[in-house]
């Protein structure tokens, strides 16, 4: 399936508290990374105090390695400092070090880092697609995509994924650029998922916003595998870059997720609070999306997958956190090296919404997280059997056809 990671049904388990800071625990079945943690600081912490805390962590970690003969651990790896205030870090620490960190009054909570990965369910080369036609039509079964010629011009879409083949003909030799890589040393999409997603957002043939610019933010490797800590670093980078260029002209797509993670949700909320629109795949386990992250974060736009017959895709998650449905079953888009492939999943639905957001920005319909409300208002009430407590709204670009 196109959605990155299998979202294991999970509510946040009871948290343990050691002299103050919560160490959030996950239920059996979640693939946590041994001795790797994400530490989130208290709200409102100053940069000076944050620097002081991290200096203390580095000093204490080195002391443990040298004086106490603790087993070798890498220590701090990523530092998070979102423009909207979320501060924290991730790293490789032994249990005793984590206990010492948890005793600090300036720590809000600690969460075990966990793995994310791709699981493909369908792939077929060079067949017709239907998703674009459905976005531009009020009736199913169309074969033409109707859209305004502005087509998202002047907007930027950040694709947090496996990377993008920026040389693909779909991106007109320049609209796609490389942003950052937080998973390996290969600035390429050696998996294919991210290129497909990028094509749906802004490809000249397959894209909803055909003139938008694409920025690749790689957080998953060739096997479609990565970590929450690396994904969050990609989220921070995209937010900062978008704000430096104009948050109201930017959208972010995350066709990825996993079991409930408070840190992932907090990072997604920070993107929205930074004034950037964020579309996220609801997940592919046919369960309530409230069990998945970052899909369960209410301030973002969570997208479920529909079929060509305007039904709920049988794999799609559902529930009150779903904002809209978008085409996600048998979607044709770009593949690395040229040409196209067909994939299914809420991963394919989400970029239709990110592309629609870029399209609406190009039309002068505003920008930022409030665009999700605009998209919901424009959507048409057609999804059959959408799932318990789930919207039946399918996205539409308002072309009137």
Curated annotation (Swiss-Prot):
Keywords in alphabetical order: Glycoprotein, Hydrolase, Protease, Secreted, Serine protease, Signal, Virulence, Zymogen
Propeptide positions: 21-119
Record-listed E.C. numbers: 3.4.21.-
GO terms, molecular function: serine-type endopeptidase activity
GO BP annotation list: proteolysis
Family in the record: Belongs to the peptidase S8 family.
Domain Peptidase S8, first and last residues per copy: 129-401
Pfam families xref list: Inhibitor_I9, Peptidase_S8
Subcellular location: Secreted
Positions of the Inhibitor I9 domain: 36-118
UniProt keyword Protease, yes or no: yes
Role played: Secreted subtilisin-like serine protease with keratinolytic activity that contributes to pathogenicity.
Major subcellular site: secreted
Catalytic residues (positions): 161 (charge relay system), 193 (charge relay system), 347 (charge relay system)
Superkingdom of origin: Eukaryota
UniProt xrefs under SUPFAM superfamilies: Protease propeptides/inhibitors (SSF54897), Subtilisin-like (SSF52743)
Residues carrying covalently attached carbohydrate according to the record: 58, 223, 253, 397
PROSITE patterns: SUBTILASE (PS51892), SUBTILASE_HIS (PS00137), SUBTILASE_SER (PS00138)
GO cellular component, one term: extracellular region
Leader sequence residues: 1-20
Protein name: Subtilisin-like protease 7
Keyword S-adenosyl-L-methionine included in the entry's annotation: no
